[in-house]
Amino acid sequence: MKIAIYDIESTGAITEWSSIIEIGGVLIDENFNEIDRFNLRGRIPEGEIPQAKALLVNGTTIDQLTKSNLSNYMMLDQVERIFKKWSPAIFMGFSNINFDCEMIRKSFFRNLRYPYITNATPNKRHDALNIVRAAHAVDPKVLKTELNAKGNVSMKLESLSRLQGFDVSGAHTAQFDAINTFKILKLIKQKIKPNLWSSLLRTYSKADTETIFKKEKMITLVEYYYGKNKFHLCAPLHPKYCIHPVYQWGQAVDLRVDPVPLLNMSINELKVEMKKSPKFLRTIRSNKAPIILDAEQGMKFEPYNVMTSDLLNKRAELIRSNE
């Protein structure tokens, strides 16, 4: 399936009140050969006041903001035409699920366009940042990295691009960032095993993600918090009950925990236990392109690497079979 990598520059960081002022992208095939690319810039909608910090970050001048050839409406019209032409594809960017994708949805909605163009059938969506984090977690040598001010590995696009030897003179401009995202993903694909690359991509839709944890007895959930990657070897709940009834996200039990006491608890006792740290119940955000790897990956890391496979399988079976 083709991959459409795009990036957005906006008038602010709050997606509800900001507008797209520049968008660029590159379309590639499965072998990372470039098929097409584009870059568009539009004027700020009349009456909107941009955030000064946003303009400082993306380097947009007042002339660019107010005198571009395309109005915001005309720019979005061209974006829609390009995305339709590129379909079907996996749409992704660098940290796009929490920002770029939301900007597309809300901008399209305000302009009476179909807001789910990047992830509704026949398209899928993923997040390059999730892929980069997971690839680095499995093999820290896959990319050159540096530490940030907090002493954690920096996962910023500009930092990663510079350390791989890519040009960063145009960082924070749309097409430039899309191209550097493409280069980093290509480098990862070249360095890791083919089956790992497939695993990193397989959560590109909510339905595909749900199929994984409904069918598999054990999974490795790779999460990122407090600036670090964490591996959780988990067993999804019984297939009938593994999706939260309200939030519609997957639920799995961390196999570091003995499930027997949990199975014997009352509902009130479970509520108390669920608030304790570390959490025994892991949430799989099915529509956010989570990283789910094979169980063998999780077994390589503490504390699972000191637990026998028989014990892990027994715990997984207890969780999986309990209704």
State the predicted function of each range:
Residues 85-88, 109-113, 131-141, 166, ...:
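Alpha-helix capping at helix-to-loop junctions
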Residues 1-3, 35, 123, 216, ...:
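Sequence-level motif detector for i,i+2 pairs with an aromatic at +2
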Residues 186-315:
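Acidic two-metal-ion nuclease catalytic site recognized across multiple nuclease folds
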Residues 10-12, 130, 180, 257:
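Short, glycine/acidic-enriched loop or turn micro-motifs at the edges of active sites
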Residues 44-58, 62-66, 123-178:
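Active-site-proximal helix-loop-helix substrate-binding element of RNase H-like nuclease domains
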Residues 1-113, 154, 162-164, 263-323:
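Conserved non-catalytic scaffold segment of RNase H-like nuclease domains
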Residues 114-122:
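Short mixed-charge
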Residues 90-97, 103, 140-207:
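Acidic, Mg2+-coordinating catalytic module of metal-dependent nucleases/exonucleases
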